[in-house]
Structure formats: C-alpha cells, structure tokens
Amino acid sequence: MTGATASTWEAARALADAVLYEGYLLYPYRPDSVKNQVRFQWGVLMPPDVVAQDPSESSAQHTEVLVDGRGDITVTVRFLQLQHRTVERRTGQRFHPVDRLDVCDAAYTVFDEAVQCEFTVPVGDEGDEVVLAVEGGRDVEHLSDPDGDVLGRLVRVREPLSFAVTTRVERPDSPYAVRVLSVRVDNRTPPPGPDSRTRRGPARPAWLGRALIADHLLLR
C-alpha cells in the first residue's frame, strides 16, 4: 500500500469511526439524559423474527459499487453489539438491582453500552457467502470505596449474534477492466432461547440486544 493509499484508507476509517458512534450518546452526553433513552436510530439490522413483528425494521442491507481495476478486494463489516449494563447494590453478602448507585464522586446508572465489532472478508472471483458470529457474555465489575469495601457492582450482558456476508461479482461487457460488486449483510440471529441473558419483550430496547447496530461497510 502506497503512502497516499494508506492516508486515504486511514481518512476513510476515521470518518467511519465517527459514523459508527453517531447516536451512541446525544448532548448533553449523560446516560440519564432523556434524549439518550432513544438511541441507535440508523444502520440497525434486526433479527428476522423482529422484522416479522415490525415491518418498519430491516434485517439486511445491500451495497453495490463499480470497481475499476483488477486488484483484490476486501470487505470490512463494522457494527456495534449492544451491552446492557445493570447496577447492583451490596447488602450484606448479596447484591440487589438498583437504578442508581453513588460511589465516591461517581454515579452509576442502568445503561445500554456497546461493543465495537469488525470483520474483514476477502472477495473471491465470483463472490461467496460467509456466516460469522459474535459471542455473547456476562462481565462483572465490582465498585469499591477508598477503603476497598465493595459497595456494589456493574453487570454487563451481551447476546450472541449471527450474520451472513454475501458478495457477488459481475463483469459487464465493457472495454474497461471494471467489475460490479454487490455486498449483502443479513442478521441471522435466532429468537432468544430460555437461557437468554438480556431483556425480553415486544419493544425496541429489548430487540436491540440481538441487532447489528450502526452497521456499515469499508471496501478496499
């Protein structure tokens, strides 16, 4: 990669980074702000069962570009995985859910965070379909006072995700070395099972746990 090409690529990534977190936090940049209770409004690919309930949602996105030249092509898929954070106060040897916990000068509230995900897929001569997965998980962070006494904890939960990247390459009748590249990203995450860790219910905040959020592509 030449210096000019590398510079262009880094500039594109910087722009994509800004887009990736658009709507993650809205001014005045506080989790308890009313405006921050309605977030993640663009590039959201819901699982198929959600789209069946609400046709205004989408489970796939399609991109088509004209490629000039014979070089190799890679597709980088980027999105956010929702991470639901709950707050628990310690009482004796047990922890109980609360809406807010103050520890020293910090206030901790229930909030939807996000984990950045990125996958790079090479494009074959004719294209291909690749099915990828993102693991779920549960992490615990203890909150202590200056003396080291545990006052509470944060519990962060993520749902597993499954999605497919389908590429297709066509070579139109042309005197030039051009190709038509189409890329489709499908959210194939199944409905939540009995052991699902995140919230349930027929509402968008619950659905977002199984969505690809701020989904977009970088082509090189």
Listing of model-derived features with the role each one plays in the protein:
Residues 2-4, 42-43, 48-220:
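Long, leucine/valine-rich, helix-dominated scaffolding and oligomerization segments
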Residues 2-45:
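Amphipathic alpha-helical packing elements
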